[in-house]
């Protein structure tokens, strides 16, 4: 699908995240066609018109207000539609209302004849990625979530500011849920092959308490931003653009995305954030980082928490009746 000369993306959800993602695609010259779908048709028309005025500064692209039927020949459908996270609300608080939205959207996309890749960003992203897989009947690899891509970027940036190294040169991951049960994989965090734990000791950068504080600032970043400005959207939009480029260009890039779990970390039948090779077929190959005992326990706990919520939600007839996988 993604090796056609004209690469087509359909975006469903033209809120703060969706419109920021569309702007990121225009800015970076990603895709040659972008259709925007939302309940508020005039908003999509206005955004398409506004974005088109930036094309003379970037690269040619067809941008338009789309309908679900336009997904029939798309390479990628990106789902940002859903109720936003409010101040004081966790991502998991959004489950039922966003499951209903996801079921409706995915059903309509599949009915169009769409055969490409789903990229899910609406929260709680791991659960909604799982739901997209269940409602679509698609193979696991062709349903991808943004996962811990943003959390990992936040982690690398926070570390970069502490150790005075370009964030792009820091190799470190956040894994698990995109949410409160996520964890930092300190056992593999490194700069130029030097473990960060050793780097901290040799350069007297961070003590144990400061390391904990740094991780907590990463984990709780969304709450801080939401309290100040009502929503997070720029960071996740650029993360989505990066994943989009990897898929459309068949890059085989290693990115921390939401991947189906088949027991590799003691977790099964759910999606969780972990590094994976990403290309034209979606998840080409999950990368199973060998975790230490403490990290493995955190991964299992994160998966168990999400699985319990999934099982409770899909026990309800309105969701169980729509399952295709």
Swiss-Prot record:
Report keywords, A-Z. Allosteric enzyme, Cytoplasm, NAD, Oxidoreductase, Phosphoprotein
What Enzyme Commission number does this protein have?
A: 1.1.1.27
Q: Which residues form the active site?
A: 178 (proton acceptor)
Positions where Phosphotyrosine occurs in the chain: 223
One cellular-component annotation, GO: cytoplasm
Q: In which pathway does it act?
A: Fermentation; pyruvate fermentation to lactate; (S)-lactate from pyruvate: step 1/1
Q: What is this protein called?
A: L-lactate dehydrogenase 1
User: From which organism does this entry originate?
Assistant: Lactococcus lactis subsp. lactis (strain IL1403) (Streptococcus lactis)
